[in-house]
Swiss-Prot record:
SUPFAM superfamilies: Ribosomal protein L14. HAMAP family: Ribosomal_uL14. Its main location: plastid. One of its GO terms (biological process) is translation. It comes from Porphyra purpurea. Part of the 50S ribosomal subunit. This is Large ribosomal subunit protein uL14c. GO terms for cellular component: chloroplast; cytosolic large ribosomal subunit.
């Protein structure tokens, strides 16, 4: 459950390290974002000499949440951190690598490029 003012780690090599959510897009509940939802965020911490700078406004898709996600088969999945991958207007990742495990629900929401870059799909 990601809401406005929530901080997320960035799980790619676009240059940002932490982003803060300022708007939740593309969900039935506009107050909270879950895995696979698109958010708008502002970069709070960034690596130097990278394409994404501090205070840039970016679009991102949530790939991990600490709040447990209930699947249709009854299984519940939860991660150690809240994380997102920065995307462009075409829903393609801006980075070339993705770090950490990614939830399988992203495949259902047509983020197949992120799934293909992920080292582990849970």
């Amino acid at each position: 459950m990601i809401q406005t003012q929530s901080y997320l780690n960035v799980a790619d090599n676009s240059g940002a390290r932490k982003i803060m959510c300022i708007r939740v897009l593309g969900t039935s509940n506009p107050s909270y974002a879950s895995i696979g939802d698109v958010i708008i965020g502002v970069v709070k911490d960034a690596s130097p000499n990278m394409p994404v700078k501090r205070s840039d406004v970016v679009r991102a898709v949530v790939v991990r949440t600490r709040k447990a996600l209930r699947r249709n088969d009854g299984m519940s999945i939860r991660f150690d951190d809240n994380a997102a991958v920065i995307i462009n207007q075409d829903n393609n990742p801006r980075g070339t690598r993705v770090f950490g495990p990614i939830a399988r629900e992203l495949r259902d929401k047509n983020f197949s490029k992120i799934i293909s870059l992920a080292p582990e799909v849970v």
